[in-house]
Amino acid sequence: LSCGDVATQLAPCINYLRSAGPLPVACCNGVKNLKNSAATTQDRRTACKCLINASKSISGVNFGLAAGLPGKCGVNIPYKISPSTNCDQVN
């Protein structure tokens, strides 16, 4: 799993995360694909770091929406998408 994979899966979510539109089906599909491809602890930590870095680098991201995204898509991930998340603690 690479940050490129994470970015590709979550690209359809960007406008939603900027509070600029409805939650697209393609975004939730990307969230689900990402969860399914993060099979190991190392993959989950990588995905976490990529998500946090991406969310910090995209201007105008609403972190409340980012944190709620997995739940809105019906996906459980073992960490919060937040700038303060310590990805090294993700199992």
UniProtKB/Swiss-Prot annotation:
Disulphide-bonded residues: 3-50, 13-27, 28-73, 48-87
Name the record gives this protein: Non-specific lipid-transfer protein P5
An example Gene Ontology molecular-function term: lipid binding
Family recorded in the similarity comment: Belongs to the plant LTP family.
Cross-referenced Gene3D superfamilies: Plant lipid-transfer and hydrophobic proteins
Key words of the record: Disulfide bond, Lipid-binding, Secreted, Transport
Gene Ontology BP term (one): lipid transport
GO annotation, cellular component aspect: extracellular region
Coiled coil feature spans: none
Function according to Swiss-Prot or TrEMBL: Plant non-specific lipid-transfer proteins transfer phospholipids as well as galactolipids across membranes. May play a role in wax or cutin deposition in the cell walls of expanding epidermal cells and certain secretory tissues.
SMART domains: AAI
Location within or outside the cell: Secreted
PANTHER family the record matches: NON-SPECIFIC LIPID-TRANSFER PROTEIN 2-RELATED (PTHR33076)
Phosphoprotein as UniProt keyword: no
Pfam families: Tryp_alpha_amyl
